[in-house]
Amino acid sequence: SEVSEVIYPGLFQNPRDRKRNRKYLETGNGPMVGFELKGGKQAGQKFIDNLQMVYHVANVGDVRTLAIHPASTTHSQLSAVDQEKTGVTPGYVRLCIGLEHIDDILADLTQALEKT
């Protein structure tokens, strides 16, 4: 599957980002990154299923790299309309980058995307 959007404050996607980051994120942007997969909910679920090293869990406080597909897990009890209202789109995947070697993380994300 293809990534249609990346959500990360360090990308400075709009002019407010720099000002906000200087005010609230003085020491950096942190390990959280989100992205939207083309293909919606099915693509998000399949991507998670294809991960081999990255853990599929709902917490974000760990030294391991974690991934979650909110539309099919934490927000699955909400209707599609209510999910959209909370910012959860069908293909949205949230990652919390851990302490593994970056090459290992990228390899796992790449192979999962290729299989999705």
Describe the residue ranges of each PLM region.
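Conserved small-domain helix->loop->beta segment predominantly found in fold-type I
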Residues: S1-V63, L78-E84
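PLP-dependent enzyme catalytic core of the Aspartate aminotransferase-like
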Residues: D49, T65-T116
